[in-house]
């Protein structure tokens, strides 16, 4: 028994709902704790590496690929997925449209990339231990799932509440999703406009350890 991959898009409405819920937990965690993720890879050497040499930039963002991003946008707006679909996607009722693993998932400028059934966190330097990054990732996603559970366990209509929870999470945290070129100078300006952090150095990052949400 190898368990269940919770980030594997499913073949049934139930499996799709599970996938979307856990996907949203990861999206929310990366957005809420982008500072802590940057801290887990902070070192003098990595400060020089990030943003060059096929390494992602210091700005934390998530790559989902165009197909999955369009599906999330359709859910957020309660609109058809594309011009060929007349029916609005309902979580727990409909299956997701088939989508291919995006060929650009090899884009090394993405710090946190979805590659079909898993995420890759690409900011860690080769000489650094993965223990701190894993601890922050697992703990932050667990915290988001705890918040989701508090909402869903009180739901009178589970499917309606689940749909609204996922829709609300997408709307509030879509700023962290970026499928473009992380090396492009325009991304720095766009990230600032979105309210994302650009912690270029270790001292800049470490200061956020004392943020109230992180203590």
PLM regions and their residue ranges:
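Catalytic or ion-translocation cores adjacent to nucleophile or general acid/base/metal-coordination motifs
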Residues: 2-43
